[in-house]
Amino acid sequence: MTEHDNGADEGLEAADADEPRIVQVHGEHGETIYAMDADHDNVADAAAYDDDNDGVIDRIAIDTDGDGLLETELRDLDGDGRIDAVFVDTDGDGHKDVAVLDTDGDGQFDRVIVDTDGDGRIDTDIRDTNHDGKADYVARDEDGDGRRDYVVTDSDHDGTFDTVHYDDPKNNPLAQA
């Protein structure tokens, strides 16, 4: 491979025209990026990043909807070589608005946080606190002030939400009945 003036390396040649083309480039911060063009339109369909050039891929970005934007990103946040976070830009505005996380490094995703209204703030927080694959905690900020307006929990982990906490009694539909 030869390096070009723009920092891009010559692409690795695919065995035939149906195989993806992979190009190695160096990012503006010195990281190594492997970009894959699966459909030969000269737009990356996926990219793998070695952010610290230690030979281990730290994150992968994927264009999951074919629009030319790498809206889905998988990351190894703790450096153990396993993906423990998935970030998605669901509305195409260039900002990730959904995160799925493995918060304790056990290989199971146990938290989902979402910006449902696109204001850049998390307004929905869903957690699996006992690692059974089911949500045990859901918090929601309805008015965009950055504070939870209500929290619903399954405190005894039987699969049924049994506790509801409203931050403001005037938003509690049970108090208004």
What are these regions, as identified by a protein language model?
Residues 1-177:
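Calcium-binding acidic motifs and repeat modules
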